[in-house]
Amino acid sequence: MKQGDFSALAKHYHNRPAYPLSLMKYILQIAGYGTKTDFAIADIGAGTGKMTAVLGSGAPKAKIIAVEPNDEMRAEGKKAVTCAEFIKGSAEATTLASSSMDFACMASSFHWSDHTKSLPEFRRILKPNGIFCAIWNARKTDSDEILQSIENEIKAMIPPLSRVSSGLQNTKDWQSVITSTGDFKDCVYMQMPYSETMSKERYLGAWKSVNDIQAQAINYGGEKLWEDILSMIENKIKDKQDIKQQYIIRAFVAKSTK
């Protein structure tokens, strides 16, 4: 398994957390939903449609296109989400028409893109003064003893582990990144708490959907090491009926310079 290859993980993605509808409604208002006619949204790196479904609820009258490069992820999205058209494309080459979108977003996926190519592409597809949002649902570890224990065990089992995400550790200055190419300006940072209560099965399934840990575990110690990590997590939660997982939602919203 390679970092960034989600083919084998698509079947587990339904276990992942969503995003708060209240925040997305607010961001969509900033982008002009409700005041503009023919409002169009591009959910880029849409995966199986976790954010796509939220956008459908927040902007039911909008045209939504979900852009996803991975065939397996896109197939799962088509089955699960009916409010959008799923097409093959990437952050660097969406295949969307120029000046066709009012709002573009990447949910927990912008860190996988080459921002020197993706940001100009987003500016190209957005209408004048269009809005781009990069958003993440980062797990909150400081008040979660089980998660802290799991993370510490994983680090001990994979000593060279390097996380590829925009969680709360080792994260980039995304405001600077988003404005670095000159394609976007006035980048605003928004943050809010969020939580979801998961069954043990879903909690474990969410871990099975995490690409960067699984890829590094397999590369470091083979499939057996990844199986050992899953067994360790399962053992940590064996006495729990369900698990309330806390998140910090981190959103970066910027205006196109077009």
Residues covered by each model-derived region:
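Conserved class I S-adenosyl-L-methionine
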Residues: 1-34
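Class I SAM-dependent methyltransferase SAM/SAH-binding core
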Residues: 42-44, 48-93
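A short acidic, Gly/Pro-enriched loop at the edge of an enzyme's catalytic core
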Residues: 92-103
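Short catalytic micro-motifs in class I SAM-dependent methyltransferases
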Residues: 107-108
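A short, conserved alpha-helix within the catalytic core of class I
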Residues: 113-121
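Conserved catalytic/acceptor-binding region of the Class I
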Residues: 123, 127-196
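Conserved Class I S-adenosyl-L-methionine
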Residues: 172-258
